[in-house]
Regions:
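Short edge beta-strand/loop segments characteristic of extracellular beta-sandwich folds
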Residues: 236-242, 417-421, 490-498
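Long, low-complexity serine/threonine/glycine- and acidic-rich segments characteristic of extracellular
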Residues: 109, 139, 181, 196-199, ...
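Short coil/turn motif common to extracellular beta-sandwich-like domains
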Residues: 229-234, 409-417, 484-492
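Proteolytic processing hotspots in large secreted/extracellular or virion-associated proteins
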Residues: 353-362, 386-432
Length: 548
């Protein structure tokens, strides 16, 4: 009894601490990051392919919309990259928070001039620099940048975050600062019932069961009756949320699982730890994502799931039903505007002669043969799985191996070593490990140890050694058949590489380095004409591109 009291108190303390954090945000007088209200097209915590979305996306229709500081402070970091957030600003505030503005088209004039000076000084388009407090002081509401489509962006929008400055963790602002008009409860499409061990059964099978729901307007049940379970059992839910006046799909704030009115699982999206982002593929069922493009949230924790999103969890969200007894299952979803959806259904426990629950061992795993070695630490997987390895033949440099199951997510990278006696001389520094996983191909850098070449992978898949001996291609987009300064403002060049990708590039006019932007998603270098290319004379253009 004493233990139960202590656990209950702990849950209450955690919950209250989260509430205090949200209440503090309400009192800090943050303003809207744009001068005009634009529709929210992505919300905090919604699932992306391999991570949680860490901010709010505002669709600005076109580029160039003014972005303002949400509170007084100073620009603490400037980022310019062909990838990720593209052009981004970080502003530290006295309140203890940092605001982040990503996918910008350009910075405000004073910042833009300083950034260009740094780029020319370093002869590099990319920039990631920290700044002292006195460099760029900003007032609340001051224009600091303009919306764009830079980096890994699919259209003109602002990606906005509020982070704790000390921890750098993004926080939820939708339930406090940036509330939206929304009276639509979440949609619940399916529930999933999991046999959580090899000895557990759902409807007499040791495989998870997905059942579609029926219902609407926040009240749902399942389309299948007579569900029987034995052994350790868990649940999951497939859902999406919607917001008034948009057609986008969003994540929800809270998910709760009740078994006979007893709370077994509670998740809440209030803060995201960047260092734990890949745990998203344990929080959500990775196999459903890669196999069926479904976002199914587990309402139970795998052994390796160490996310801090759970105010209350009992027995990792799992339970063992008694034979012959019916259990009422209720799962509740709450969106960021407190709209509630509920699904109710019943399962019955049944006998299982082999239902003894044995905790899965968590050991280092090592597979060795003459041509392949695989090492996975004890915490490489979220749960214990065997790692099957199959030889699939050979290419010019090495054997080809299928390692593991592509539908199983990895918590930590595994080490893969392939043997080859054919790699030396000129191709040594051009050798990579090719990883094919879920129809996607990546080249991983390798470390040579004798005749073994080792790479580290965050995914299972099919692996082999390859050499990238083909140089990148360069193709002008701008036509040079007539004077271009009189008809165009920019020079554009298409660059691409069929294997390892673009690592470095440089543009020279009359043998002088000039600043060219790189749009990685479209593979385009662009140079805006300036004093380095005066009109009325012929110029020599040189483009240098290096792959990885």
């Amino acid at each position: 009894m004493k233990l139960k009291i202590i656990l209950s108190t702990l849950n209450i303390l955690i919950y209250c601490n989260l509430c205090v954090s949200q209440n503090n945000l309400n009192k800090l007088n943050f303003s809207y990051p744009l001068q005009v209200n634009y529709p929210l097209t992505g919300n905090f915590g919604e699932p992306r392919s391999k991570h949680f979305h860490t901010g709010l996306d505002y669709y600005t229709v076109e580029e160039g919309k003014a972005i303002v500081a949400v509170q007084e402070g100073y620009v603490s970091r400037i980022l310019v990259s062909p990838y990720g957030y593209g052009l981004a600003l970080y502003v530290d505030h006295p309140s203890g928070y940092t605001s982040v503005y990503g996918h910008l088209s350009r910075f405000d004039n004073s910042i833009a001039r300083w950034v260009e000076e740094q780029q020319y000084l370093r002869k590099n388009f990319s920039l990631d620099t920290l700044l002292p407090p006195e460099k760029f002081i900003v007032k609340q509401g001051e224009i600091i940048a303009y919306s764009g489509n830079s980096g890994q962006s699919a259209g003109p929008h602002l990606h906005f975050e509020l982070r704790e400055t000390a921890s750098e963790n993004p926080v939820n602002t939708l339930t406090s600062v940036y509330k939206i008009t929304d009276n639509i409860p979440p949609d619940i499409m399916s529930v999933v019932i999991y046999p959580a061990t090899k000895n557990s059964l759902v409807n007499q099978k040791n495989e998870k069961l997905l059942i579609k729901t029926t219902g609407t307007a926040g009240k749902y049940t399942v389309s299948k009756n007579g569900i029987v379970c034995s052994g350790l059992t868990g649940f999951g839910i497939e859902y999406t949320d919607r917001i008034n006046y948009t057609t986008n799909k969003y994540g929800v704030w809270q998910v709760k699982l009740f078994i006979d009115d007893s709370l077994y699982y509670h998740s809440r999206m209030d803060k995201i730890d960047f260092s734990l982002q890949n745990r998203k593929n344990s929080h959500f069922d990775y196999a459903y994502l890669v196999g069926e493009k479904r976002d199914v949230q587990r309402c139970w924790l795998e052994e390796g799931n160490d996310l801090k999103l759970y105010p209350a969890v009992k027995n990792r969200g799992l339970f063992i039903p008694d034979a012959g007894k019916n259990y009422h299952i209720r799962i509740e979803l709450t969106d960021y505007n407190s709209n509630l959806s509920t699904v109710n259904f019943t399962i019955m426990g049944t006998e299982n002669a082999n239902s003894e629950y044995i905790t899965n061992p968590r050991k280092d795993q090592l597979a060795i043969d003459a041509e392949c070695r695989v090492e996975a630490g004890a915490d490489a997987l979220f749960s214990h799985y065997e790692i099957p390895i199959a030889a699939l033949g050979k290419n010019d440099l090495s054997a080809i191996y299928r390692i593991g199951n592509e539908s199983i997510a990895l918590k930590r990278k595994i080490s893969i070593s392939l043997y080859s006696e054919k790699i030396s001389g000129d191709i040594l520094h051009k050798t990579f490990m090719r990883c094919e996983c879920n129809k996607s191909i990546r080249l991983l850098p390798v470390i040579r140890e004798g005749n073994y070449f080792t790479a580290y992978s965050q995914e299972f898949g099919t692996f082999s050694l390859v050499a990238d001996t083909t140089p990148p291609t360069i193709e002008p987009v701008t036509k040079f058949d007539k004077p271009i300064l009189s008809t165009q403002k920019q020079l554009k060049i298409k660059v691409s590489d069929d294997l390892s990708g673009i690592a470095e590039y440089s543009l020279y006019i009359d043998d002088v380095w000039v600043l060219a932007g790189y749009d990685a998603k479209n593979g385009v270098l662009s140079y805006t004409f300036d004093e380095h290319m005066p009109a009325g004379k012929e110029h020599t253009l040189k483009v240098s591109v290096l792959d990885r």
